[in-house]
């Protein structure tokens, strides 16, 4: 009985660590345009999904973590929440302290409008700032376990394993659409 339980536990652990990503063929990354792919991040699933921009076909999924365990929308600078909405990759930095960094255009017009409405409604302090420098990045060297254990540790960014961010960094051009949803 004990051997059976241990076996099932090991199968479960292996499935958990391999279920997000299946090897997929990527179209020629060297010729990718901003419309070749799009990304959907679902915070409640701790998942980043990559889709083919022309067919809408799912390509691959990656495990991710965020800032706060409260998966609500970013309200203001310093709340450690990840913003929701439709954004675009506007910058790529390599090397970076977290392997690679792809900055998104937060705050954009939609984010600023939500922020100003919340401020006018008194939901956030009148002196609050909207924040910025949000992106998708890796983890500190040798700390991929933070992703496996769903440890939300960022200041509002999206973090994945270093080998995954390197793959995404090499594949996704500036201008790629990134939708972040709860």
Regions found by a protein language model. Give the residues of each.
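Functionally constrained cores in energy, signaling, and assembly domains
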Residues: 17, 43, 160
């Amino acid at each position: 009985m004990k051997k059976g339980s241990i076996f099932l536990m090991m199968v479960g652990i292996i499935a958990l660590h391999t279920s997000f990503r299946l090897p997929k063929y990527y179209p020629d990354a060297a010729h990718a345009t901003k419309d070749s792919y799009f990304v959907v991040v679902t915070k409640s699933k701790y998942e980043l999904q990559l889709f083919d921009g022309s067919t809408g076909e799912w390509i691959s999924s990656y495990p991710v973590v965020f800032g706060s365990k409260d998966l609500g929308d970013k309200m203001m600078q310093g709340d450690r929440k990840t913003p929701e909405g439709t954004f675009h990759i506007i910058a790529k930095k390599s090397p970076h302290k977290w392997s690679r960094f792809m900055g998104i255009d937060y705050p954009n017009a939609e984010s600023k409008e939500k922020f100003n409405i919340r401020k006018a409604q008194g939901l956030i302090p009148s002196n609050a700032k909207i924040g910025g420098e949000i992106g998708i990045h890796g983890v500190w060297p040798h700390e991929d376990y933070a992703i496996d254990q769903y440890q939300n540790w960022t200041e509002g960014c999206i973090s994945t394993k270093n080998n995954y961010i390197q793959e995404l960094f090499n594949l996704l051009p500036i201008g790629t659409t990134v939708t972040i949803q709860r």
